Design a protein with these regions (language model features):
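The feature marks helicase ATPase cores and/or their adjacent C-terminal helical subdomains
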Residues: 1-625
Length: 625
C-alpha cells in the first residue's frame, strides 16, 4: 500500500470470485487481470482494444465499493466519455454496489464535469457570477454576433472566426497576437457574457486552473475527499488536462493513489487540427494487457501495422474466425464514391445472416471517417474530403450532446434517439433532464437549476425531500417513451410536466408557451417487410434489390466510435492536408517505414478505426488516374 488511509482495503481471491459472479456473462479473470484488480499502487495499465479494460476497472470499483470504509471520502473515476459509467449501470445498476458507486461520496464522470463541479463552479460563484449555460459552440456564436459587422469583417480577413471569442491559455487572453481596439472589443464581449452566465467548456477548465494556482488548499481538500483516482481512457488526456490533474492530485503516492487505464495508440484527443503529443501516459513500469478479446488474430495483425507502441496486440479466436471473412479494401474512382457505401452494405449481407445482424444489432455496422464536418465545398484535388462526400445526407451535428435546442420536445426526441442507439435509458434521462432544466430556468427567469455534471441530480437538489420521490416517478414516466412522439402523446406528456412544475412552484405562462409547443419531426422512414420504422439520423438503410434483405449502416467520425465495438466497420478515405490512405498506405505494407514522421495523429486515428470491428474490417482508397 502507498497511503495509510487505504491500508485496510485488501482485495482477496474471495473478492475476485464474488465479482466474477456479480458481473455474470461468464466473466472470468486470468492471472494477469487478477493482478491488475488487486494492485493498489500508483501505476498505469496499457490495455489494447478489446482487452476488457473497462470490465476490469468496473470489477475493481465494485470490490472497492463493497469494502469502502468511509462515509465522506470517495473513489474518483474520470474519463472523456461515459463508457465506464454506462458499464457500471449495465452490470451493477440493479444492485446495492452499483447504486453506491453511482452516488455520494463517489464521483464517476468526465474530467470536465469533475473540475466544473469541484473547482470551477465554486470558484466562479465566489466571484459573484452565476452560471446559466456552458456550451462552446453556442456561446462563441453568441459573442461573435454581438461584435459589430465591421469587427467581424476585419477578423474574417485575418482568418479568424467564432472561436476567437473565448479565453485561450489563461483567463483574460485570446488567440489574437495584436492588441488594440479589436482585442479590447472581444474581451469586453467575453466579460459581459460571462456576467450574464455564459461560458465555454474550455473557459471552465481555465477557471479551474486559476483556482488551483491561487489557492493551495484546494488540492489538499480534493485529495482528502478522493484518496484514490482512476482515469479511464487516460491516453486522451491532453497536456493541459494533465497539468490540471497534477495540480489537483499533487501528492500522488503520498496523499492519493492514481491509476490510468488506456491505450497510448489511441491518443487522438478531440481536435484533429491541434498537435498535442503528451508523454504523461503510460508512466514507466506500466502493466500491459495485450490480448484482445474483441477480434481474432487477422484483424489484430492488420491493426498492428498502424500501432505506434512497441508492444503488439494479440487477437483471440471467436465465432467468426472460421468463416474466412474477406476483409476488404474498396478501390474506387472519384465519381463512384457513393457507390462504396452500397458495396459495403452488400458485403455485409453476403458475409452475415439476418440472424447474426440482428444478434449484433446493438453493436451495428458502421462507416467512419477522420474528417466529417463540412466547412466548404470540396476542391477537386481533395475529393473525397470528408464523410459528406460519400453521402450528402450526413449531418455531423445531428445528435451532439452539447446541442442547445429551441424547443423542449427536441430534447425528448434526442433522448429517444440515444436510447434506440445504445439501449441505455440513462442517456434518455440525461436529455430529458437538460430540457427540464431549461424549462424551469425559463419559467423562473433565472439560473434556478445550476449547471453540473449530473443535471438530474441538480434538479433533485433544488426540491424539498418530500417532493423528490414524486419527481423521480414523473421523470420515470416521461422516459418510458421509446418510439416517435405523436402530437396527442406530447399533450399527454405536457400534462405530466405541468404537475411536475408545481413541485417547483411553477405554472405554465406565456413566457414558456413557445418553448413547450409541439413541432413536427423530420419524416425519415423506411419500409421493412411491411412495417414502417423511423430511420435515425446518420443511418443509411441498404437494401439488396434481389433478396430485399436490408442492413442499417450508421455513419460517424472516428472520434465518435472510440471505445465502441462494431460487427463491421468501413474506414473511409478522407483528406486532411493529404489523403489519409495515401499517407499511411506504406505502413500497411510488409515493409513499413522506419520513421513515423508527421503521421502520428493520422496513424492513431486509423488505429482507433481499425480496432472497432469484431468480424469485418474494410478500408477504401481513391483510385489514382
Amino acid at each position: 500500500m502507498e497511503i495509510d488511509r487505504l491500508k485496510e482495503i485488501e482485495i482477496t481471491d474471495e473478492d475476485i470470485q464474488w465479482v466474477e459472479e456479480t458481473l455474470g456473462h461468464e466473466v472470468h479473470f486470468d492471472s494477469t487481470r487478477v493482478n491488475i484488480i488487486k494492485n493498489m499502487y500508483s501505476v498505469d495499465i496499457q490495455a489494447f482494444p478489446g482487452s476488457g479494460k473497462t470490465t476490469i476497472l468496473v470489477a475493481k470499483l465494485a470490490i472497492l465499493a463493497k469494502k469502502w470504509p468511509y462515509d465522506n471520502l470517495g473513489i474518483c473515476v474520470l474519463s472523456h466519455t461515459n463508457v465506464a459509467r454506462e458499464e457500471i449501470e449495465e452490470r451493477l445498476g440493479n444492485n446495492e454496489i452499483g447504486r453506491k458507486l453511482l452516488s455520494y461520496p463517489h464521483f464517476i464522470g468526465t474530467l470536465h464535469s469533475f473540475f466544473d463541479t469541484y473547482v470551477a463552479l465554486p470558484w466562479i460563484r465566489s466571484k459573484g457570477l452565476n452560471i446559466d449555460l456552458i456550451n462552446t459552440e453556442y456561446v462563441n456564436f453568441l459573442r461573435w454576433m454581438r461584435l459589430s459587422y465591421e469587427t467581424r469583417y476585419y477578423l474574417k480577413r485575418q482568418r479568424k472566426n467564432e472561436s476567437i471569442c473565448s479565453y485561450k491559455g489563461c483567463i483574460g487572453e485570446i488567440d489574437l497576437d495584436k492588441g488594440g481596439e479589436t482585442k479590447a472589443k472581444i474581451l469586453d464581449v467575453i466579460e459581459k457574457t460571462q456576467k450574464e452566465g455564459y461560458f465555454t467548456f474550455d473557459e471552465m477548465l481555465l477557471y479551474a486552473k486559476q483556482a488551483l494556482e491561487e489557492l493551495d488548499g484546494i488540492s489538499s481538500s480534493i485529495q482528502q475527499r478522493f484518496p484514490i483516482l482512476f482515469i479511464d481512457e487516460a491516453q486522451d488526456t491532453d497536456s493541459f488536462q494533465w497539468d490540471l490533474l497534477e495540480k489537483a492530485f499533487n501528492k500522488d503516492g503520498i496523499c492519493s493513489i492514481r491509476q490510468g487505464y488506456g491505450d497510448s495508440n489511441q491518443a487522438i484527443y478531440n481536435n484533429l487540427y491541434v498537435d498535442d503529443e503528451s508523454s504523461h501516459f503510460p508512466r514507466e513500469g506500466a502493466l500491459v494487457l495485450n490480448e484482445s478479446m474483441r477480434f481474432d488474430s487477422r484483424i489484430a495483425k492488420l491493426a498492428n501495422t498502424v500501432a505506434l507502441s512497441k508492444e503488439r496486440m494479440d487477437g483471440t479466436e471467436n465465432v467468426f474466425s472460421e468463416g474466412k471473412i474477406a476483409h476488404t479494401i474498396f478501390l474506387f474512382q472519384k465519381d463512384k464514391a457513393p457507390q462504396v457505401i452500397d458495396e459495403f452494405g452488400q458485403l455485409i449481407l453476403n458475409t452475415f445472416s439476418d440472424k447474426e445482424i440482428s444478434e449484433y444489432q446493438k453493436e451495428g455496422c458502421h462507416v467512419v471517417g477522420m474528417v466529417h464536418c463540412k466547412k466548404e465545398d470540396t476542391p477537386e484535388k481533395q475529393f473525397p474530403k470528408g464523410i459528406y462526400d460519400y453521402w450528402e445526407l450526413y449531418e455531423p451535428e445531428k445528435a451532439s450532446k452539447s446541442m442547445v435546442h429551441k424547443f423542449l420536445i427536441q430534447y425528448f426526441r434526442y433522448g429517444i434517439i440515444e436510447f434506440q442507439r445504445s439501449g441505455e435509458r440513462s442517456l434518455q434521462v440525461e436529455w430529458i433532464s437538460k430540457g427540464l432544466r431549461r424549462l424551469i430556468n425559463k419559467a423562473k427567469k433565472c439560473n434556478y437549476v445550476p449547471v453540473s455534471g449530473n443535471i438530474f441530480a441538480s434538479l433533485l437538489k433544488v426540491l424539498p425531500d418530500d417532493c423528490q420521490t414524486d419527481f423521480r416517478k414523473m421523470v420515470y414516466e416521461l422516459s418510458g417513451t421509446s418510439d416517435a412522439i405523436s402530437k396527442s402523446k406530447w399533450n399527454s406528456m405536457l400534462g405530466v410536466m405541468k404537475q411536475m412544475l408545481k413541485l417547483f412552484d411553477i405554472t405554465i405562462s406565456q413566457d414558456i408557451e413557445e418553448f413547450i409547443k409541439w413541432i413536427d419531426e423530420e419524416n425519415n422512414e423506411v419500409q421493412d417487410g411491411g412495417k414502417i420504422g423511423k430511420v435515425l439520423p446518420n443511418h443509411y438503410i441498404y437494401t439488396d434489390k434481389e433478396t430485399q434483405r436490408i442492413v442499417d449502416i450508421e455513419f460517424g467520425s472516428i472520434h465518435s466510435v472510440k471505445g465502441r465495438t462494431h460487427l463491421a466497420t468501413l474506414v473511409l478515405e478522407t483528406f486532411l492536408k493529404t489523403h489519409n490512405m495515401k499517407a499511411i498506405l506504406k505502413f500497411l505494407c510488409a515493409t513499413p517505414p522506419k520513421s513515423v514522421g508527421k503521421n502520428q495523429k493520422r496513424l492513431r486515428c486509423q488505429y482507433v478505426a481499425m480496432t472497432r470491428a469484431r468480424a469485418l474490417l474494410c478500408l477504401d482508397r481513391v483510385k489514382l488516374l
